Amino acid sequence: MSGYTSDQLVAHSTSDGQLVPATQRARITSIQAGGAASSSIKLYNGTGTGAGNVLIATYIFGTEGLEVYVPGSGILFEQGVYLDLTATPGVTITFT
């Protein structure tokens, strides 16, 4: 029997929160977000937006939405992924 296996995982959220647990290392390989006027997403290494959590990536977009496919090994998050979103109806990430 032949088949295809992948170590890719998917997480989706419609509000601020933990996408990948803080106890888990992750490499984001793609990001998609629904479009709305003046949308933004911020991705933090850690458990929130406060002290001790590092802002890794910020994306600002409008009604066109967002599709990012990260080449190579992806964007590394050593202590989980926390999502801070504004205006967008939802965000989906794929990660290993």
Stretch-by-stretch model annotation:
Residues M1-T96:
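Surface-exposed, low-hydrophobicity beta-strand/loop segments enriched in small/polar/acidic residues
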